[in-house]
From Swiss-Prot:
All copies of domain HTH rrf2-type, residue ranges: 2-129
A Pfam family it matches: Rrf2
Source lineage: Bacteria, Pseudomonadati, Pseudomonadota, Gammaproteobacteria, Enterobacterales
NCBIfam families registered for this protein in UniProt: PRK11014.1 (NF008240), rrf2_super (TIGR00738)
Protein name (record): HTH-type transcriptional repressor NsrR
GO biological process, one term: negative regulation of DNA-templated transcription
Transmembrane residue ranges: none
Amino acid sequence: MQLTSFTDYGLRALIYMASLPEGRMTSISEVTDVYGVSRNHMVKIINQLSRAGYVTAVRGKNGGIRLGKPASAIRIGDVVRELEPLSLVNCSSEFCHITPACRLKQALSKAVQSFLTELDNYTLADLVEENQPLYKLLLVE
């Protein structure tokens, strides 16, 4: 299964925020500079992450964005469920003649659930804590 760029960059934004020293805020511009993503795309991602409670946005002169929960409380599987459209096949099409007997959707659904269950074993903290090579690449030591 390949994640959409929306989910990919959502996870990367969370990784960046989790890599920062505790309490440090960042900005959407800073995140887009680190990953070379369009600002408009990142604004949409951060808005969805904010609505889901993964990111807190603070307005004003000293505002910015930061994690909305501790990194140890953010399960990667939950983030993927929030950001990723998980329907792998469109079985509602009237043009598919095998829909009444097809078992593909069920098989793919089970595969997606296995994928998400495995991702549920990891938190954001698992990906960033004590990861010096990551900090060097993100320049956040």
